[in-house]
């Protein structure tokens, strides 16, 4: 192969980087780009005085025509020699390079293993597998003076990357939205022209016109190095004097920031407080791990025995252990004499150090543990957490306990900005630290690991891995918007407008990611809101915003001042994804198999949870993010933005006139003809003309909204977020039973039906979710705060209002089915303060379920606190001791609330029973009145005595009539006295003669009766011979 003169700009850029301790970036295009890695590495070796640079080679699945296995390479060479296709006396430069160079091969999917490590050269292949996250994670492992090499396959034009399908695009496609536009790739290629330390070259090392460093010139040699930093450190070291071990360890540091950080660590070590936390936050390459290593060496010198270190992987601790041993060297410790090093036997850890045993004065141990092994920290005195932002937040919480804790976190790098640590955990630690310092040691707080801890915060600004102002770092931060957190709104000084004066605009993504200077400034402001208001941020979010076809961006802006040409600062940013409109065939196929396709989170999730085949066919929008800057929080801007968004999708911005025509904005895409007619060596790539791009901000009144049925949101459940979405009219339909691994929060899905759409389905789903949530409160949701659980139940009313409440009220029959008579007696006695709380604990689940199921009438009204107590005790099965801590109230007050609510419920049950008896008695009277209406109430017309006398008279009259009937029924003829007038006169004369003396008995002659119908008794009477009757006067 003939030799060719090398373009002088390539070695010049590498030499300048080594001289300024800055990194260089090379993009190599062509099928033989792999072979140029050897030449670039050789140029780097010639420019650096240090040892041969080590290499990190990142790839997706297969290396570019070679293997990383040394024996396989040797066998391949032997086979080729044996077959006669290779000269045994010649060596391939690339194979020689692979043999003598220290190369670490790593899959992209295992890139977390390289955290905390430093390399002289980075090679990135398989461009289609790259993501913003991988770019930030890998490029920042390269030291100052090193080079980054990106290998691209053969291209006719770099604009082919504008339409290249990336691996991550498969996640963005949905059934209704499958056309992905690679806007991020276009912005990435255009940004290379603004990177002064970047050269884009072909596989013959020809510099292409797009290169940002094409005008590079050699720097004049520097005779003297800048030792101002070392002089400052030396002065600090001298000021410490004989202070052991701080003085010796400060001498190992590289920057003044790092030296001060080590001193802060030493101060906490000397205090030997079991409730201290020291947090170290910095960007990548600032020396966090080195400072932690020196701090551990200081802890050993101060007699700490049990020290535990944790990080995502033991391979991330290479730098940390390296500086532990440098600290030992500064303290005159010798290996094998004073300490031993134990390496891991796990092949996946590549012989990483996992334990150090120190036995100089007494037994001391430095032990690596996995982040999940917080249960082994019982005897810990110091726990060190490196790369804390890369560890799930729940695990970090568990690692904090009654011992000294050091933690380091990257706030500007692949983790996005480490916001989960800074916004969640550190904020809680700050608040607890203020409480602890202000009110002393609170007894209740001391029972929690996190409560009552003191917090010291350290930040490192000056980089160590590379020089301050490294151009690759500046380019990467601008490309991925990693330094957006430093942006400050102008409204902080100009005042805030009223929310009603603000307007919502849709952002054109084609213009936003066009790399135009105005668009870039607006993008940085939007990302600053994301970073400042959200704790889950990743560089991949940027590519999701730009490339996902179903996503849309909206911004809330203050009133526009026409005299001011500058774009106003966005107050609120909304990112949403259009979902749904899935074919019935796909729905049935997925439900029958129990699987779901990618994307369309809410349609698939709700269809699966409720086994409904119609919901996924509805069109909807999911709020991916709503970000408001911290200075605008709780001022009504988020509510205003959501109000305008709802109105937009409800069609309230569209004019009712027939003349309305929606404005359609489109951007011309790169065609095949344009690519074929260009040459790579002469191609000039620049930002699109502003006249060909659509407006950055689109008025909602000029756009045709998509036909949607609902707007939904999926978020990690927190009290503040749940309160916001409930206030916006959203109804919960799904709550994940397992907490998220990264944040420890339960995912919640809430929906709101747009005005004018069918809403019965939402009411049915809400009722079903309400019942399921009640049943699950005693299981996975037991750890919820009672107030949060109550708020979730209350939010269901936003959906159940669309259906008629079919819940029947409690009846006496149901009461008898649920409670026995003994249960009601116990409850009544407890409500009268005659029994202890434990006697009725078994009744609380029944009472709570009846109350929250809506069985009790509306007259039973419990205060929110009483409802929380009933829910916590009856549905979550919590104890009074637990509630005492949760509500921050003494137990006697909680029990008093329980007694009050018991009285209200018992009173209601008594009323139901009384009403049931009254209805039973009233039914008899109703039957007697033959279904007539009951007469109106009239007062009594007489007194009680008169009423009694009247009743007695009626009774006597009835008695007489009955007696008369009986008398009339007797035959008296047989007792009649017979005789004529002569006989009676004779009798009277006889009486008169006696004149009252002697017997007054007279006799009258009778007649015999003739009656053929006489009975047998009368016949016997007739047979008697007596014919006279006697009577006494």
UniProtKB/Swiss-Prot annotation:
User: Which Pfam families does its entry note?
Assistant: GNAT_acetyltr_2, NAT10_TcmA_helicase, TmcA_N, tRNA_bind_2
Pinpoint the N-acetyltransferase domain residues. 560-694
Domain of life of the organism in this record?
Eukaryota
Per the record, the major location class is: nucleus
Gene Ontology molecular function: any one:
ATP binding
Question: Where is this protein localized, as stated in its record?
Answer: Nucleus, Nucleolus
Catalyses:
a cytidine in 18S rRNA + acetyl-CoA + ATP + H2O = an N(4)-acetylcytidine in 18S rRNA + ADP + phosphate + CoA + H(+); a cytidine in tRNA + acetyl-CoA + ATP + H2O = an N(4)-acetylcytidine in tRNA + ADP + phosphate + CoA + H(+)
Tell me its EC number(s), please: 2.3.1.-
**Which residues lie in coiled coils?**
none
What are the binding positions for ATP in this chain? 285-294, 465
What are the cysteine partners in each disulfide bond? none
- Has UniProt tagged this entry with the keyword Ion transport? no
List every stretch annotated Disordered. Answer: 988-1033
Record keywords? Acyltransferase, ATP-binding, Nucleotide-binding, Nucleus, rRNA processing, Transferase, tRNA processing
* Gene Ontology cellular-component terms listed: 90S preribosome; nucleolus; nucleus
**Which residues of the sequence carry a binding annotation for acetyl-CoA?**
626-628, 633-639, 727
Question: Bias category Basic and acidic residues: which stretches?
Answer: 1005-1026
Function comment: RNA cytidine acetyltransferase with specificity toward both 18S rRNA and tRNAs. Catalyzes the formation of N(4)-acetylcytidine (ac4C) at positions 1297 and 1815 in 18S rRNA. Required for early nucleolar cleavages of precursor rRNA at sites A0, A1 and A2 during 18S rRNA synthesis. Catalyzes the formation of ac4C in serine and leucine tRNAs. Requires the tRNA-binding adapter protein tan1 for full tRNA acetyltransferase activity but not for 18S rRNA acetylation.
Q: HAMAP family from the xrefs?
A: RNA_acetyltr_Nat10
Cite the record's note on assembly: Interacts with tan1.
Report the family membership: Belongs to the RNA cytidine acetyltransferase family. NAT10 subfamily.
- Tell me the protein's name: RNA cytidine acetyltransferase
């Amino acid at each position: 192969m003939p030799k060719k003169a090398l373009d002088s700009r390539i070695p010049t850029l590498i030499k300048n980087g080594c001289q300024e301790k800055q990194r260089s970036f090379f993009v190599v295009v062509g099928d033989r780009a792999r072979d140029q890695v050897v030449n670039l590495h050789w140029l780097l070796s010639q420019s650096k005085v240090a040892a041969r640079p080590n290499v990190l080679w990142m790839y997706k699945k297969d290396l570019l025509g070679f293997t990383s296995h040394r024996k396989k390479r040797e066998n391949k060479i032997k086979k080729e020699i044996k077959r006669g296709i290779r000269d045994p006396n010649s060596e391939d430069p690339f194979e020689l390079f692979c043999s003598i160079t220290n190369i670490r091969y790593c899959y992209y999917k295992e890139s977390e293993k390289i955290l905390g490590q430093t390399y002289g050269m980075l090679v990135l292949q398989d461009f289609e597998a790259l993501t913003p996250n991988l770019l930030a994670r890998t490029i920042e492992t390269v030291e100052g003076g090193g080079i980054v090499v990106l290998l691209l396959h053969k291209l006719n034009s770099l604009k082919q990357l504008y339409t290249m399908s990336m691996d991550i695009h498969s996640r963005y496609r949905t059934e209704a939205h499958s056309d992905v536009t690679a806007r991020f790739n276009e912005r990435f290629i255009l940004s290379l022209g603004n990177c002064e330390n970047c050269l884009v070259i072909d596989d013959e090392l020809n510099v292409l016109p797009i290169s940002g460093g094409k005008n590079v010139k050699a720097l004049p040699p520097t005779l003297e190095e800048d030792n101002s930093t070392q002089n400052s450190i030396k002065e600090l070291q001298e000021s410490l004097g004989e202070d052991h071990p701080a003085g010796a360890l400060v001498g190992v540091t590289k920057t003044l920031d790092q030296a001060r950080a080590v001193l802060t660590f030493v101060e906490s070590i000397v205090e030997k407080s079991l409730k201290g936390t020291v947090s170290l936050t910095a960007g990548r390459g600032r020396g966090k791990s080195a400072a932690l290593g020196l701090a551990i060496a200081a802890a050993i010198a101060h007699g700490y025995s049990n020290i535990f270190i944790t990080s995502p992987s033991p391979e991330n601790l290479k730098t940390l252990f390296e500086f532990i041993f440098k600290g030992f060297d500064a303290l005159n410790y010798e290996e094998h004499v004073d300490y031993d090093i134990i390496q891991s036997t796990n092949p996946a850890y590549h012989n990483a150090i996992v334990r150090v045993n120190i036995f100089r004065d007494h037994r001391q141990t430095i032990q690596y543990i996995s982040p999940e092994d917080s249960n082994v920290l019982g005897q810990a005195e110091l726990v060190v957490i490196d790369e804390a932002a890369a560890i799930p937040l729940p695990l970090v919480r568990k690692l904090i306990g009654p011992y000294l804790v050091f933690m380091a976190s990257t706030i500007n790098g692949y983790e996005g900005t480490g916001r989960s640590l800074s916004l969640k955990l550190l904020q809680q630690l700050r608040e607890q630290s203020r409480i602890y310092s202000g009110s002393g040691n609170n007894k209740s707080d001391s029972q929690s690991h996190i409560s009552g801890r003191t917090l010291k915060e350290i930040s490192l600004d000056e980089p160590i891995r590379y020089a301050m102002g490294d151009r690759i770092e500046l380019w990467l931060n601008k490309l991925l918007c990693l330094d957006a957190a430093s942006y400050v709104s102008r409204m902080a000084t100009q005042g805030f407008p009223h929310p009603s004066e603000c307007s919502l605009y849709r952002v054109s993504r084609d213009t936003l990611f066009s790399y135009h200077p105005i668009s870039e400034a607006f993008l940085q402001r939007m990302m600053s809101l994301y970073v400042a208001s959200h704790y889950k941020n990743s560089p991949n979010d940027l590519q999701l915003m730009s490339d996902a076809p179903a996503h849309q961006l909206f911004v809330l802006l203050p009133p526009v001042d026409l005299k001011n040409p500058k774009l106003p600062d966005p107050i609120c940013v909304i990112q949403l994804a259009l979902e749904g409109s899935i074919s019935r065939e796909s729905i049935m196929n997925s439900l029958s198999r129990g699987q779901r396709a990618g994307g369309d989170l809410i349609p698939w999730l709700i269809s699966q949870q409720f086994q409904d085949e119609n919901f996924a066919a509805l069109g909807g929008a999911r709020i991916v993010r709503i970000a408001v800057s911290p200075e605008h929080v709780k001022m009504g801007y988020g509510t205003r933005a959501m109000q305008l968004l709802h109105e937009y999708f409800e069609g309230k911005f569209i004019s009712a006139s027939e003349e309305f025509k929606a404005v359609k904005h489109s951007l011309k895409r790169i065609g095949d003809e344009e690519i074929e007619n260009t040459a790579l060596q002469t191609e000039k790539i620049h930002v699109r003309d502003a006249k060909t791009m659509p407006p950055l901000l689109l008025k909602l009144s000029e756009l045709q909204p998509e036909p949607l049925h609902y707007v939904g949101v999926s978020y990690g459940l927190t009290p503040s977020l749940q309160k916001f979405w409930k206030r916006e009219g959203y109804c919960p339909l799904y709550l994940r039973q397992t907490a998220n691994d990264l944040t420890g929060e339960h995912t919640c899905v809430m929906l709101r039906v747009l005005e004018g759409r069918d809403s019965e389905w939402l009411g049915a789903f809400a009722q079903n979710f309400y019942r399921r949530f009640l049943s699950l409160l005693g299981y996975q949701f037991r750890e919820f705060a009672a107030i949060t659980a109550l708020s979730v139940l209350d939010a269901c009313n936003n959906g159940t209002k669309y259906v008629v409440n079919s819940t029947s009220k409690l009846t006496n029959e149901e009461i008898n089915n649920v409670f026995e008579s003994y249960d009601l007696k116990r409850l009544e006695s407890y409500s009268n303060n005659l029994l202890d709380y434990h006697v009725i604990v078994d009744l609380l689940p029944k009472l709570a379920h009846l109350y929250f199921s809506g069985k009790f009438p509306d007259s039973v009204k419990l205060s929110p606190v009483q409802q929380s107590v009933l829910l916590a005790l009856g549905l979550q099965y919590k104890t009074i001791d637990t509630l005492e801590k949760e509500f921050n109230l003494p137990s006697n007050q909680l029990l008093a609330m329980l007694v009050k609510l018991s009285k209200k419920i018992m009173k209601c049950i008594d009323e139901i029973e009384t009403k049931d008896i009254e209805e039973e008695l009233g039914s008899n009277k109703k039957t007697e009145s033959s279904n007539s209406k009951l007469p109106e109430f009239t007062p009594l017309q007489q007194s009680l005595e008169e009423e009694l006398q009247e009743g007695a008279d009626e009774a006597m009259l009835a008695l007489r009539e009955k007696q008369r009937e009986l008398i009339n029924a007797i035959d008296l003829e047989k007792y009649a006295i017979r005789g004529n007038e002569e006989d009676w006169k004779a009798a009277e004369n006889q009486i008169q003669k006696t004149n009252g003396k002697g017997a007054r008995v007279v006799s009258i002659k009778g007649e015999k009766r003739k009656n053929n119908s006489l009975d047998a008794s009368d016949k016997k009477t007739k047979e008697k011979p007596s014919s006279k009757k006697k009577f006494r006067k």
